[in-house]
Amino acid sequence: MIIDTTEVQAINSFSRLESLKEVYGIIWVLIPIFTPVLGITIGVLVIVWLEREISAGIQQRIGPEYAGPLGILQALADGTKLLFKENLLPSRGDTRLFSIGPSIAVISILLSYLVIPFGYRLVLADLSIGVFLWIAISSIAPVGLLMSGYGSNNKYSFLGGLRAAAQSISYEIPLTLCVLSISLLSNSSSTVDIVEAQSKYGFWGWNLWRQPIGFLVFLISSLAECERLPFDLPEAEEELVAGYQTEYSGIKFGLFYVASYLNLLVSSLFVTVLYLGGWNLSIPYIPVPELFDITKRGRVFGTIIGIFITLAKTYLFLFIPIATRWTLPRLRMDQLLNLGWKFLLPISLGNLLLTTSSQLLSL
């Protein structure tokens, strides 16, 4: 059987076409995976740079300025330095718990990004229990911190892990009650539905105005969950050296460093989604869709505008936790627990009862 030249060329072109299809298929699988990872990484780098610049302004000094333009690559330089440092293990500690702890803390926080809507219908997992899934996942992170403290075989590390667990339990309940109030107002636990419920009434329909008490409780509780000053008792330098991070070095210490900023970004994004209208701008007396001509330019342009609005609100809100770090003194452990159990818990419970009563009366 003789095959002429044209048939050989056709077979070769067909095989090349099949190879290209396989390559494109792999690329389309990898794009949804690496795009959120890249976005989250850039978001964390921006937060670190913002914190250093704002902190420098508050303290009247010059922030980072040599690594990249305006020092924006300083966080990347610090991460590279940690990556090449020696990874030390405690001689008498539990090495398995010591190694698993940072990974649990980071993974549990990363999973929270699944239910955050960055734009109209732009969410990785639009679940009917979105906000409560976030609360359930975020409660896993202190387990990793406790494992790290216990596995270090160090009294300072163990005390830091215990403080992290006690602090998380104390402030998780008021946080959950505030989220439950928002869920009752929106008649849904989906993050997308909560944003759309606020969009119906414009700027004055934001839950910030409908739930001012809940917003304050949520703000304080989220600061405590992120272990930011004045609630950074699990890693208080003057008392516990570095808390549960004392024995860590290299990439494992870097994971804790990244986890703290990931948690801060998640909390700010949920404040934006639950209280600040999410991707909806709604400036009073300014018709935003007509201003940007979203309806005529198509859905892609509207999605880009929604992402920009969500991130702008998030980074503007980040000024509050960054400023409180250099403004308020650290609480004592008894003051922290009293604030959570004796003040925030009754206030959040009363807010939930008021919200439930108003919803029942409006039926």
Swiss-Prot record:
Bilayer topology term: Multi-pass membrane protein
Chief place of localization: plastid
Keywords: Chloroplast, Membrane, NAD, NADP, Plastid, Plastoquinone, Quinone, Thylakoid, Translocase, Transmembrane, Transmembrane helix
InterPro entries for this protein: NADH_UbQ_OxRdtase_su1/FPO, NADH_UbQ_OxRdtase_su1_CS
Reactions mediated catalytically: a plastoquinone + NADH + (n+1) H(+)(in) = a plastoquinol + NAD(+) + n H(+)(out); a plastoquinone + NADPH + (n+1) H(+)(in) = a plastoquinol + NADP(+) + n H(+)(out)
TM spans (from-to): 26-46, 98-118, 127-147, 253-273, 300-320, 336-356
Group of enzyme by EC: translocase
Subunit structure: NDH is composed of at least 16 different subunits, 5 of which are encoded in the nucleus.
PANTHER family: NADH DEHYDROGENASE SUBUNIT 1 (PTHR11432), NADH-UBIQUINONE OXIDOREDUCTASE CHAIN 1 (PTHR11432:SF3)
Name of protein: NAD(P)H-quinone oxidoreductase subunit 1, chloroplastic
The organism of origin for this protein: Helianthus annuus (Common sunflower)
